[in-house]
Amino acid sequence: MGSFASRADLKAIEAEAAWEDRDLPRSMYAFLSRTKDAHGARPALSYQLLSTPGSKSETLTWSDLHGRVTQAANLFRSLGVGEDDVVAYVMPNTVETAVT
């Protein structure tokens, strides 16, 4: 079963296999890496910075998104943020929010 619309559907999905037995990525970065490997050139997200006439949208592929997320991770690491640290931020609804 791939999707669900009711509580019964959810129960059916959960009955298929225990979550720990599924081949699920263990982190968001692992998810992005797996998706980049499978669909690197496909669109991951599109955004439009301005809403003026003639403003064009920008689209990031899964490879682009993975690259930007890696850049952000490298920045945090260079600032001394480690694996067990927590980073919180407040940002507007922009593409930078998605890649940070």
Language-model regions: role of each:
Residues 6-7, 94:
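Short, structured coil/loop segments at alpha-helix boundaries
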Residues 8-18:
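Short, contiguous pre-domain boundary segments
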Residues 16-24, 52-58:
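Acyl-group handling in specialized metabolite and lipid biosynthesis
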Residues 41-100:
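Conserved AMP-binding/adenylate-forming core of the ANL superfamily
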